[in-house]
Curated annotation (Swiss-Prot):
This is Zinc finger protein 687. The modification Phosphoserine is found at residues 102, 129, 140, 227, 242, 251, 253, 266, 271, 374, 433, 495, 1057, 1082-1083, 1085, 1106, 1118, 1184, 1191, 1211. One of its GO terms (cellular component) is cytosol. The lineage of its organism: Eukaryota, Metazoa, Chordata, Craniata, Vertebrata. It is found in: Cytoplasm; Nucleus. Coiled coil: none annotated. The gene is ZNF687. Gene3D superfamilies: Classic Zinc Finger (3.30.160.60). It comes from Homo sapiens (Human). Belongs to the krueppel C2H2-type zinc-finger protein family. Changing S242I: In PDB6; uncertain significance. A zinc finger (C2H2-type) spans 533-552, 705-727, 764-787, 792-815, 827-849, 858-881, 963-986, 993-1016, 1135-1158, 1200-1222. Residues 97-111, 297-310, 915-925 have a biased composition (Low complexity).
Length: 1237
């Protein structure tokens, strides 16, 4: 074969067409088999060559990062997990077209990804094709020192110096320490089935290793703390004097030992040696059809014998990836024995000038001893020498290294490369179960990962994933079919495709995230950040920024989706770039929803040539200064928050905002940190807030913590009690959010502005996809459209079909006599499989499922957005509405009454003229917002407020405006979307111009603007008629008012010039009426009339400037002066009551006044003559007959004008007809006429 220099084992092994497993023996695996101690493995199919820039030598992270740097392996704490919702509509043919990949491409596309362990059908497709499907590039086998492997030629056997690379110092391995006593096996650990044949050691004679075929089977060892399904292949290492493998007879059950040297792992289960909090390194499985398997190098499974079809637990094995950036120079020898077995031997080429010193004879890595360590702290601080007794009495000694020496990805890669030097041969007729193939590596690099209170169990086993909870966005379904193409990892059905996509996104990595060497030599002059440039999606950090860019640009597979939020078709080539895009939506309070998912492997020549792959850690936190520690997070202050709904309780308490006025000191509310509800003593203010915000059970006798008075869900019984007392306005006034005790004067202000308690709402989480909705109708609509299945039921028989054509074909073939009948639609509940014949029944049925799904959500007080966490809402407020809040706070008093803009009159609207943010908030939110009142600003502020309101409402619907459905609380940025939604979802016909602030809609934009200005802004630009006495007639246009006055009252509105008014030469009266005249002039000139709720003609008595004619305060006792005054008034065109001196604009008003105030029904003689404006012909005094009663007809020669309302008629008949409209006046006139006769 010759020497070959290759960046990894995959490219190297892909050069040989050796069938590892028959394609007919593809494994069908389901999610129920995807659990392991390290959490269910979530694969990223087809991402075999997704290179992780771990060593980053090629990317510029600095060459030669020491593999023994223990601080590089510290896993980062958790940060919020990004979720992606997939509603796939891809056709199965799209995935079938990918099934014909070549072996080389398949090796790269279907290998272990940096995103996590390979899934069920992904593993099988990557390694089960007729051609050698390689496990991807995770094994860049090169020592960190830059040297290549050196083949050790020893007489008879080749001792495997497996761990010489991993000790803190090479000499530590040879120190003979007392052998550790064998510890008892874990509960349930049984003796694994014996191996049919012994593992073979490399022999020095010849460039390859020829295993003897007739070697007797080696008895399997009973491993310490290993389950019965986790036998492990003995990776024998030692000096030349170690016993030969052929000399080891088979034994039924050797005694249990600590650190069993077998590395064969059960493919069906992960070894329980690794607790759910300890990452487990797992092998890249290669399957062989009924023949001795060839185990590719993996950090934990150097030799994995396999036989037969693999079981379905493959996706629970996370494949560790190597992190060395140096290629491995190896020699491969492939031999097919006479019995049909295939032996593939990988040895290093002697190129390292200073190879590590060989260990003692028979040295092993005692994996079990490593994994026996507790989840958080290792048990051994230094190397230990353990003794293993084999079945024939032979005792082998091995060195067990502490966890600290194997903490980075580079070390794990070296271990994988070292282990790959040996091959295990099994005879064809082995009795080993397919699930016993090299499946579970017992965590060669156990790490103490941070804990999180809100861990979510993924998969059916309910195991906890490390670090933080990852929300499974789709229900797990068993994969229905395998993918059979070399390198093709795409499922053939949409459900399995979406399931595979979810496994990619939620995969767990069992190796720590890479940490670069951030201490470059002084002569380099590099200024590196304290924690490097870190990928928030996988936790890997890099020394240089371009290395992080290369990390995001790597090509592992092609993921093509349609982002529903961006409304664009996007293509991603790795998981980190996809999650980075999803995080951008998450920062805006949205969960990324995508559809039309298509996943394809990337050709080998299109992948970026990065030799290294490092597994991801799915959770990360922003970089923190100082050394990284591994505390148990989520149990106190500073707990890392997660965006998953299931981890809301683990977030740090949200403290009140510092927006309270100085008059209300906040410190007085926290003099004693004792809960007044349950008397629990807290440490400080943050502890008090955490006590009131942590999720807890409801009060005794209550089923939930939902307030029956308002739509609000409280976190626990203490918060609920304080909230209930808030409704009753009873002391003590305890804030349900922070637990502070406030005075009643400051309590409401604190709730509204500091703690934002009023922003809580009741939301509903979809039980299928975990998306939270703000209303019952919206989640019902979501469940019906997204998760419920609709069937077409045959009207004759009980059969139902998913499509109408299928039901029609069934009727045509099975019921020919009923072909004309139509199939009936039936609806299946997505949560309990109940079938309903009517859609409304299904909607009502959802109520019993939604009660347990209630969650607390938070609505932004300035826009309709809903948030699952209060902290996210506060960040949104700070980033989006900060300027508006500052302006509002500047103009806000210490405390004020709440005013709603919808009901305030014109004067109140003017008084809030400077409160521009209040108008903007009320115009952009669909819910009634409470705007604190402010001191009355100057009048000129009125115009900017109105312009701002009109500007905000005239927009096209973008920004914080938009339209919100009042039924389902869905928000739409575009008007057309809102109109279509109302018609489609709720069956309501909405006109083209709907109002953002209420449910009314209009046919034209001017009508909408007028509606908003009058009804919502309180600026009533209307024109009331002064002459109408019946009702309050107002007009929206001055032109319409003038026409009305001309037609109805027979007056010219233009004749009411500013000169109209009292011109008495009396100083006091003139001074009293001067302001009135000026105000009326100003009102007429700016076209702003008083509100029609108060008739302008009847101004308040004593208000000299309220109307056009105030009451005449001067009254004379002599009739002469009265007549003089009356003459002046008549000439001036006004009407005055001679009894009290009040002036009126029309005779009708004067008549009504005299009848109500003075009980006079007759005419007023000359004093009641109709006054005309300047320029009009003056009516003769004889128009009203003082002795003629209430006759509608005027005196001879006068115009035909009604004396009640002053309307002019063209004929006496029309005047009589008109006079009938005055009711009692007409009746009295008839009665008077009869009396005269």
């Amino acid at each position: 074969m010759g020497d070959m220099k290759t960046p990894d084992f995959d490219d190297l092994l892909a050069a040989f067409d050796i069938p590892d497993i028959d394609a007919n023996e593809a494994i069908h695996s389901g999610p129920e088999e995807n659990e392991g101690p390290g959490g269910p493995g979530k694969p990223e199919p087809g991402v075999g060559s997704e290179s992780e820039d771990t060593a980053a030598a090629s990317a510029g992270d600095g060459p030669g990062v020491p593999a023994q740097a223990s601080d590089h392996g510290l896993p980062p704490p958790d940060i919020s997990v990004v979720s992606v919702i997939v509603k796939n509509t891809v056709c199965p043919e799209q995935s079938e077209a990918l099934a014909g990949g070549s072996a080389g491409d398949g090796a790269q596309a279907a290998g272990v990804t940096k995103e996590g362990p390979v899934g069920p059908h992904r593993m099988q497709n990557g390694f089960g094709s007729p051609e050698p499907s390689l496990p991807g590039t995770p094994h860049s086998p090169a020592p960190p020192s830059g040297g290549t492997w050196k083949e050790k030629g020893m007489e008879g056997k080749t001792p495997l110096d497996l761990f010489a690379h991993f000790g803190p110092e090479p000499g530590d391995h040879s120190d003979p320490l007392p052998p550790s006593a064998p510890s008892p096996t874990r509960e349930g650990a049984l003796t694994p089935p014996p191996f049919p044949s012994s593992f073979e050691l490399a022999q020095e004679n010849g460039p390859g290793m020829q295993p003897p075929v007739s070697s007797p089977p080696l008895g399997a060892l009973k491993q310490e703390s290993c389950s019965p399904h986790h036998p492990q292949v003995l990776a024998q290492q030692g000096s030349g004097s170690s016993p030969k493998a052929t000399d080891i007879p088979a034994s039924a059950s050797p005694p249990p030992v600590a650190g069993v040297p077998f590395f064969k792992q059960s493919p069906g289960h992960q070894s329980p040696l690794a607790s759910p909090k300890v990452p487990v390194c797992q092998p890249l499985k290669e399957e062989d059809d009924d023949e001795g398997p060839v185990d590719k190098s993996s950090p934990g499974s150097p030799q994995s014998p396999s036989s037969g079809a693999e079981a379905a637990d493959e996706d629970s094995n996370d494949s560790p990836a190597s992190s060395s950036s140096r290629p491995l120079k190896v020699r491969i020898k492939t031999i097919k024995t006479s019995c049909g077995n295939i032996t593939r031997t990988v040895t290093q080429v002697p190129s390292d000038p200073d190879p590590p010193a060989p260990l003692a004879e028979g040295a092993f890595l005692a994996e079990a001893s490593l994994l026996k360590l507790s989840p958080a702290t290792p048990t051994s601080e230094g190397p230990k020498v353990v003794s293993v007794q084999l079945g024939d009495g032979t005792r082998l000694k091995g060195t067990v290294l502490p966890v600290a020496t194997i903490q980075n990805a580079s070390t794990a890669m070296l271990m994988a490369a070292s282990v790959a030097r040996k091959a295990v041969v099994l005879p064809g007729g082995t009795a080993t179960s397919p699930k016993m193939i090299a499946k579970n590596v017992l965590g060669l690099v156990p790490q103490a990962l941070p804990k999180a209170d809100g861990r979510a169990g993924l998969g059916t086993g309910g195991q906890k994933v490390n670090g933080a909870s990852v929300v499974m966005v789709q229900p797990s379904k068993t994969a229905t079919g395998p993918s059979t193409g070399g390198g093709t990892v795409i499922s053939r059905t949409q459900s399995s495709l979406v399931e595979a996509f979810n496994k990619i996104l939620n995969s767990k990595n069992l190796l720590p995230a890479y940490r670069p060497n951030l201490s470059p030599p002084a002569e380099a002059g590099l200024a590196l950040p304290p924690t490097g440039y870190r990928c928030l999606e996988c936790g890997d950090a890099f020394s240089l920024e371009k290395s992080l860019a290369r990390h995001y640009d790597r090509r592992s597979m092609r993921i093509e989706v349609t982002c529903n939020h961006c409304a664009r078709r996007l293509v991603f080539f790795n998981k980190c770039s996809l999650l980075l895009h999803a995080r951008e939506h998450k920062d805006k309070g949205l969960v990324m929803q995508c559809s039309h998912l298509v996943m394809r492997p990337v050709a080998l020549d299109q992948m970026v040539g990065q030799p290294d792959i490092t597994p991801l850690l799915p959770v990360a936190v922003p970089p923190v200064s100082g050394p990284l520690a591994l505390p148990a997070l989520g149990k106190g202050e500073g707990a890392i928050t997660s965006s998953a709904i299931t981890t809301v309780a683990a977030e740090a308490p949200v403290l009140p905002l510092s927006t309270e006025p100085p008059a209300a000191p906040a410190t007085s509310a926290y003099t004693c940190f004792r809960c007044l509800e349950c008397k629990e003593q807290c440490r400080d203010k943050a502890g008090m807030a955490a006590h009131f915000q942590q999720l807890g059970p409801p009060a005794p006798g209550a089923t939930s913590n939902v307030c029956p008075t308002c739509p609000m869900m409280l976190p626990n019984r203490c918060s609920f009690s304080a909230h209930q007392r808030m409704h009753k306005n009873r002391p003590p006034h305890v804030c349900p959010e922070c637990g502070g005790n406030f005075l009643q004067a400051n309590f409401q202000t604190h709730l509204r502005e500091a703690c934002l308690h009023v922003s809580r709402r009741v939301g509903y989480r979809c039980p299928s996809c975990s998306v939270v909705f703000g209303g019952v109708n919206s989640i019902k609509s979501h469940i019906q459209t997204s998760h419920c299945e609709v069937f077409h039921k045959c009207p004759i028989c009980p059969m139902a079909f998913k499509s109408g054509p299928s039901a029609h074909a069934h009727l045509y073939s099975q019921h020919p006599s009923f072909q004309t009948q139509q199939a009936k639609l039936i609806y299946k509940c997505a949560m309990c499989d109940t079938v309903f014949t009517h859609k409304p029944l299904l909607s009502s049925h959802f109520d019993q499922h939604l009660l347990p799904q209630r969650v607390s959500v938070f609505k932004c007080p300035s826009c309709p957005l809903l948030f699952a966490q209060k902290r996210t809402m506060l960040e949104h407020l700070k980033n989006t509405h900060q300027s508006g809040r500052l302006e509002e706070t500047a103009g806000k008093g210490a405390g004020g009454a709440l005013l709603t803009p919808k009901t305030e009159p014109e004067e109140l609207a003017v008084s809030q003229g400077g409160a521009a943010p209040a108008t903007e908030e009320s115009s952009s939110s669909s819910e009634e917002e409470e705007v604190p009142s402010s001191p009355e600003p100057p009048r000129p502020a009125k115009r900017p407020r109105r312009e701002l309101g009109s500007k905000g409402l005239k927009g096209g619907g973008g920004g914080p405006g938009g339209w919100t459905c009042g039924l389902c609380h869905s928000w739409f940025p575009e008007r057309d979307e809102y109109v279509a939604h109302m018609k489609k979802e709720h069956g309501k016909s909405v006109k083209k111009f709907p109002c953002r602030l209420c449910e009314r809609s209009f046919c034209s934009a001017p009508s909408l603007r007028r509606h908003v200005r009058v009804n919502h802004e309180g600026i009533k630009r209307v024109y009331p008629c002064r002459y109408c006495t019946e009702g309050k007639r107002t007009f929206s246009s001055r032109l319409i008012l003038e026409k009305h006055v001309q037609v109805r009252h027979g007056l010219q509105l233009g004749a009411q010039s500013p000169g109209r008014g009292t011109t008495l030469a009396r100083g006091s009266s003139a001074r009293a009426q001067g302001p009135g005249r000026k105000r009326r002039q100003s009102s007429d000139s700016c076209s702003e009339e008083p509100d029609s709720t108060t008739p302008p003609a009847k101004s308040p008595r004593g208000g000299p400037g309220s109307g056009g004619h105030g009451p005449l305060r001067y009254r004379s006792s002599s009739s002469t002066e009265q007549s003089l005054m009356m003459g002046l008034r008549v000439e001036d065109g006004a009407q005055q009551c001679l009894d009290c001196g009040l002036c009126f604009a029309s005779p009708g008003s004067l008549s009504r006044h005299r009848f109500i105030s003075h009980k006079k029904r007759r005419g007023v003689g000359k004093a009641s003559a109709l006054g005309l404006g300047d320029g009009e012909e003056e009516a003769p005094p004889s128009r009203s007959d003082p002795d003629g009663g209430d006759s509608p007809l005027p005196a001879s020669g006068g115009p035909l004008t009604c004396k009640v309302c002053g309307k002019s008629c063209d004929s006496p008949l029309n005047l009589k007809t008109h006079f009938r409209t005055h009711g009692m006046a007409f009746i009295r006139a008839r009665q008077g006429a009869v009396g005269d006769n």
